[in-house]
């Protein structure tokens, strides 16, 4: 195709009689990211390369819309991929208008019933609550980063409509409407119970909506969302935490005990006994040799949650781990 773009490291030119000289080949860098606020340089060569890879990944995936990958034929605006990287992206670059444009696309694609799309701006996709939460999560992230109340004012009606849509989907609970799924901690080495995750996501939605309503001066709605959050939190801790050991469990009562279940519980604020949950996150991380056992939603918060529990050395060991799967393993393989 003549009118397209690709993320790549290497190119191959075929079908020509004479091999072109290197200086005859031109590569054009195109991105919505015009500059980065800062950079990271350390005494650790692999860590420096990792930081560089993050910057290039952001450049390549931010072309008019945030995409899931720049190098293959998909290159779609998956909402789950978008919201998990939002915090990092906003710390790296000034992207307020970029993300507000994405929020507008999600609102434009919202169904009459209130369901948000899993892909924007083209619509469609699948994923459920872990993807459809993106508008609430990102609107609040933008407000925290920039303090512009107009962002919340503009998108609050759509978020409120979505929360109304969620009322009859079975959350909090274990017998849920199929629309809640099907995706959880996507591509994780160890599987975390879907119902544990979906209820945790619902808690964060309700909690953030109470904060958003409070920021907008909508006191009655703030209290309603606070009550919903409290209800979900109570259910989550009674259902997904074993009372004796404090370990996480699946909806059927069997042991879950994954890094993601502990990291999500801490990061989203749904855990009642944060100290105990934090101890289990540290224990689990040590047990798997400081490798990464999380997927889409557990990975980005893992080191931060370890650090917040006072396990700075554990977080550092995980950051510098090169065994598979880890942050630096791809770098050792040439990434």
Q: Where do the protein language model's features map onto the residues?
A:
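Extracellular/oxidizing-compartment recognition motifs
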Residues: 1-71, 80-81, 97-100, 116-121, ...
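Active-site core of glycosidic bond-cleaving carbohydrate-active enzymes
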Residues: 77-335
């Amino acid at each position: 195709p003549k009118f397209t773009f690709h993320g790549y490291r290497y190119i191959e030119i075929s079908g020509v009689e004479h091999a072109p000289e290197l200086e005859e080949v031109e590569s054009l860098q195109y991105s919505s990211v015009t500059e980065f606020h800062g950079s990271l340089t350390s005494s650790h060569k692999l860590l420096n390369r990792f930081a560089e890879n993050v910057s290039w990944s952001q450049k390549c995936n931010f072309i008019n819309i945030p995409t899931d990958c720049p190098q293959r034929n998909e290159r779609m605006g998956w909402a789950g991929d978008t919201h998990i990287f939002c915090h990092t992206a906003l710390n790296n670059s000034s992207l307020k208008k970029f993300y507000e444009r994405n929020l507008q696309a999600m609102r434009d694609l919202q169904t009459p019933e209130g369901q948000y799309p899993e892909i924007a701006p083209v619509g469609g996709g699948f994923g459920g609550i872990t993807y459809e939460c993106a508008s609430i999560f990102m609107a609040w992230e933008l407000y925290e980063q920039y303090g512009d109340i107009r962002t919340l004012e503009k998108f609050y009606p759509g978020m409120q409509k979505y929360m109304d849509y969620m009322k009859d989907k079975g959350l909090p609970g274990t017998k849920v409407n199929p629309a809640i799924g099907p995706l959880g901690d996507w591509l994780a080495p160890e599987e975390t119970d879907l119902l544990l995750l979906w209820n945790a996501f619902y808690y964060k939605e309700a909690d953030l909506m109470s904060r958003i309503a409070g920021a907008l001066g909508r006191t009655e709605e703030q209290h309603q969302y606070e009550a919903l959050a409290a209800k979900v939190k109570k259910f989550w801790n009674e259902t997904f935490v074993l009372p004796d050991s404090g370990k996480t469990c699946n909806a059927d009562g069997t042991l879950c005990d994954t890094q993601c279940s502990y990291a999500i519980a801490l990061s989203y604020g749904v855990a009642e006994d944060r100290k105990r949950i934090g101890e289990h996150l540290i224990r689990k991380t040590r047990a798997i040799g400081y490798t990464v056992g999380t997927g889409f939603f557990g990975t980005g918060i893992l080191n931060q949650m370890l650090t917040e529990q006072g396990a700075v050395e554990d977080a550092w060991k995980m950051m510098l781990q090169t065994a598979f799967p880890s942050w630096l393993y791809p770098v050792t393989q040439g990434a």
